[in-house]
């Protein structure tokens, strides 16, 4: 890994799946034409809102489901690594809630990895929507995922996971060099915490962070923060977006990783290890 260009795609997805996929297609093409070899989509890129996730999830149990097929075909078309935000995937048992699955596809369209979102956003906030209950629709994942890529070891996380630093410490123990974190932070929490949490995860784990967010007004009661960002292992913001659709890009460089880790050899000094 040396000088690999990566991109984060910011969207304002709604409930119209066909429209969302078309916007994703255009934005991914923009990133690829700019030289990106790894492109990361935001959480819920294909459907964001009150649409029935169970109907989508049932179709995506099959690797040939429409959303998974879209991701595979798009990765293959552009010859890129593609992190597909999250899509709902039904469980094996009929009564089991779907998982919010984040897929990584290779340049040839093959599936390299799947991460199911572990930490579900069940909170009450003083905003227009007020009540968020992801666990009403989804079951939590159970397994950490870190996969070898041309960008180095790529760790996967999603949105609310960001608030649980022990998860990323465990990924660091598995050799993570780059973290992809598809997200849909609310405007309220994003304005307060988004950048500081992302910079903290980059600095404390000495990794690159690629964090695409949903960014805008989705409905009368839903607004996300935006502010998609790419951060280096020293905590420097290499690229950022405001609100609305955007594509941001930067270079992931092995020499920068090595320099940060040599300057502050915290991995060698670590005395406490997170189980798992």
What residue spans do the PLM features occupy?
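Active-site catalytic loop in hydrolytic enzyme cores
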Residues: 93-174, 187-190, 196, 262-266
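Cys-nucleophile CN-hydrolase/nitrilase-fold catalytic domain and related Cys-dependent amidase chemistry
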Residues: 17, 26-116, 185-201, 205-207
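Extreme N-terminal starter segment of soluble prokaryotic enzymes
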Residues: 1-7
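A conserved C-terminal secondary-structure "cap"
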Residues: 257-276
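Short polar catalytic/cofactor-binding loops
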Residues: 10-15
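Short, acidic/polar
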Residues: 19-30, 163-169
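CN hydrolase (nitrilase-like) catalytic-core segments centered on the catalytic cysteine
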Residues: 63-83, 153, 159-248
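Short beta-strand scaffold segments in enzyme catalytic cores
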Residues: 84-86, 100-104, 145-147, 228-230, ...
């Amino acid at each position: 890994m040396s000088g690999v260009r990566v991109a984060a795609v910011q969207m304002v997805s709604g409930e119209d799946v066909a429209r969302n996929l078309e916007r994703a297609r255009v934005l991914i093409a923009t990133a690829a034409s700019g030289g990106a070899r790894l492109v990361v989509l935001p959480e819920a890129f294909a459907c964001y809102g009150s649409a029935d996730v169970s109907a989508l999830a049932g179709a995506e149990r099959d690797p040939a489901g429409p959303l998974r097929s879209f991701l595979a075909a798009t990765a293959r078309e552009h010859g890129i690594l593609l992190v597909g935000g999250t899509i709902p995937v039904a469980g094996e048992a009929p009564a089991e809630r779907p998982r919010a699955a984040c897929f990584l596809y290779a340049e040839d369209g093959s599936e390299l990895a799947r991460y199911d979102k572990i930490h579900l956003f069940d909170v009450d906030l003083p905003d227009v929507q007020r009540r968020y209950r992801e666990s009403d629709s989804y079951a939590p994942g159970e397994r950490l995922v870190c996969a070898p890529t041309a960008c180095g070891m790529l760790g996967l996380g999603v949105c609310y996971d960001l608030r649980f630093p022990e998860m990323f410490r465990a990924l660091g123990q598995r050799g993570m060099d780059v973290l992809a974190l598809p997200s849909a932070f609310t405007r309220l929490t994003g304005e307060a915490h988004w950048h500081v949490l992302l910079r903290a995860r980059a600095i404390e784990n000495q990794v690159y962070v690629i964090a695409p967010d949903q960014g805008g007004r989705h409905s009368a009661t839903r607004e996300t923060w935006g502010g998609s960002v790419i951060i280096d292992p020293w905590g420097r913001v290499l690229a950022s977006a405001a609100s609305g659709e955007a594509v941001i890009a930067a270079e992931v460089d092995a020499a920068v990783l090595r320099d940060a880790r040599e300057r502050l050899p915290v991995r060698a000094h670590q005395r406490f290890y997170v189980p798992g």
